[in-house]
Amino acid sequence: MTDMLREAPLGQIIRWATKNKLLKYPEERDDFDLPSTYSTLLDAAETKTPILSRTNTRGTNHAVESEHQRTRASSPLLSDSGIAETSELEDAETEKEERSPYTAADKDVEALSLNRARSRLEAMPYTEARLELEAELSLARTETRPIVPLKTSDGNILVDWYTTDDPANPQNWSDAKRAFVSTVICLYTFVVYTGSAIYTSSEEGLIREWGLRPVDASLPLSLYVLAYGIGPLIWAPLSEIPVIGRSPVYASTMALFTILSLPTAMVNNFAGLLVLRFLQGFFGSPCLANGAATMQDMYSLLHLPYALVAWVSAAYCGPALGPLLSGFAVTAKGWRWSLWEILWAAGPIFLVMIMLLPETSTPNILLRRAKRLRKLTGDNRLMSQSEIDQKEMTAFKILAEAIVKPIEITFKDPAIAFVNLYTAIIYGIYYSFFEVFPLVYPVSYGFSLGMVGVVFTCILIACMIGIAIYCAYLYFYLVPDIMKNGLRVQESRLVPALFACFGPTIGLFMFGWTARESIHWIAPTIGITIYGASVFVVMQCIFVYVPLSYPQYAASLFAGNDFLRSAFACGSILFGRPLFVHLGVGKGVSVLGGLSVIGIIGMFALWVFGARLRARSKFAMS
C-alpha cells in the first residue's frame, strides 16, 4: 500500500512538499545497497578496464550461441514451425549487430537472458521481436536473476530493472495490484462514457424550459462525444513523453473533469452548457486515449486481450447505461439531475486515482530511477533509455506526428482507411440509438422515460454475450494455438469478425422493421442485442489487428481512429432524429443497415488481401 501511495499523484506531491523526506524510494534509504551489477560496472569504468572486443570474446560468443540453440530447441516460437525461421532470425540479428550502439561484451550479457531483453523492449512499441519475446516469456517461467545494465558506445550506462522479478516493473506486480489498477481505469472509463449519454434523459426538460428545438437539445451530447474524440490527439502523445508519464495526465484531467461537473449542473444558459459539456468531454478523454496503453504496461501479450476486454466493456456499456441511471431520476427531480449524477460518480473515482493510482509507464519509472541513482552515486553516466530518446523529442514534434501521421496513413493505406470508415459507421449507428429509441418505445409501446432507459440494458446483455464469445475464442483457440504454433499472420485475428460482421446488418434490419405496435417490443430489442453483441466482437478483432500490423504507428492510429469515430458519432446524433422522422424508423434504420454492409465486404477483403496490402504498405509490418 505504501508503494502505491508513493507512486500515486498524491504521493508525488507529498514527496515534493517534503523534499523527498517522506515516502522514500529504496535508493533514497540509508540501508540501500547498489546492485553489484551496477557497482562492478562503475568500478570497472573508473579503473578504465578495457571493454572486451569482438576478437577476444570468441569463447563467450560460443557460449551464447549454445544458449540460443537450447532456447530455440525448447521454444515453439523459435522452432522451425514458428513464424520466423532460425536463419531469418540470425540474419536479422547480424544486421542489427552492425548498427547497434552497444558494445559486444554488453550484447553477450544481454543474450544470456530473455528476461534481460524484455526489460528494454517494454519501452518500445509493438515490433515482431517484441511480440515473439512477450509470448516466449509468458510461456516459460525463468529463474530470478540480476539484470546486467548495458553500456552504450558513448559511455552511458542504461538504468534498467535490478532483477527479472523487480517489484517496480508493472509486469511483475501481484495479480491483486494489477486487478486494482485495471478496475480503477475501467471505472474511470465507465464514468466518462456514461457522462455522454446520461444527459439524453434531460433533453425534453431543456426543450420545455429553454424553448429549444430537438436538434438543438441534442447538441450537448454531440459536442461531448466530439470532444472526447479530439482529446486523444493531445493526451495520448503527451502521456508518452517519459518525463510526464500516464498518472499525472489521468489525475490532472480527471480533476478538471470533476470540477467542471459542478458548473455544468448549475449553468443557466444554453451557450454555457454547450461550452461546459465540450470541456467535460475533452478533459475526460484520457481514459479513451491511454486506457489500453495502461493495460499494455501491466500485462504480457497472452494476457493483454483479457484485460482489454474488461476495459472495452466499460467503454461499451457506459453510454448504454447512462439513460437508465438518469431516466427515473430526471422524471422525478428535473433535467439537471442527470448532470449532478456525473459529479457524484466522478468525485470518488478522482479521489481513488489521486491517492492510489500508481504510474505504469516503464520509460517514466526508469527515468526517475536513473535520476535517483545519479544523485546516489554522483555518476552522470547513469541514464535511462527514455532520457536518451527524449533528447530528440519535443512536445510540438510529438503532437504534430500524432495529428498528421493518422491522416497520412488513412489516405495512403487501404486497410486503415477501411478500419477507420467501418468503425466510424458502427460508432455512429450506436449513438443514433439515443435518437431513435424515444421515437419507438414511448410512441409505439407507451414506455415512460425511465423505462426507455431500461431498454438500453439490452446493450449490457449484448456486451456480456460478446465477452463470452470472444473470451471463449481466446481461451479455447487463440492462446493454445500460440503456445503450440507461435504467432500466426495478423489476419488470423480477424476470424471471429468474419462471422460477427453479419450481425450488425441483421440486427439493424430486425430492429427497423419490427419496431411497430403490432409486434411485441421484445422483437426490436432482440435486434439491438444482436447488433450490440456482434459489434463488440468485431471491434475487439479490429483493435487487436491494427497494433499487430502497424506497431510503429499504433498509438497515432488509435488516436486518429478515436477522432474519426467520435466525429461521425457527433454527426449521427444530429442527423439521426431528422432521418428517422422524415423517412420513418423502418426506412431510416435500413439506411444505416445498408451502410453496415460495407463492413461485411471490407472484413472479408481484409482477411483475403490483408497480407498483400501490408506487403505494399510502407507503414505496416509484413
Regions found by a protein language model. Name each.
Residues M1-K177, L357-E401, L478-Q490, R614-S622:
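Intrinsically disordered, low-complexity terminal tails of fungal membrane proteins
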Residues I14, L23, K177-P214, L219, ...:
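Extracytoplasmic
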Residues D175-S196, K412-Y430, T529-A533:
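Pair of pore-lining "gating" transmembrane helices in MFS-fold secondary transporters
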Residues Y193, G205, S222-V225, G229, ...:
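C-terminal transmembrane bundle
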Residues G195, W210-G211, I234, V243-I244, ...:
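Helix-breaking motifs and short loop linkers at transmembrane-helix boundaries and internal kinks
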Residues I230-A271:
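Conserved MFS/SLC helix-loop-helix module at the cytosolic interface between two early adjacent transmembrane helices
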Residues L276-A315:
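Cytoplasmic helix-loop-helix junction between adjacent transmembrane helices
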Residues A315-N364:
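Helix-loop-helix hairpin linking two adjacent transmembrane segments in secondary transporters
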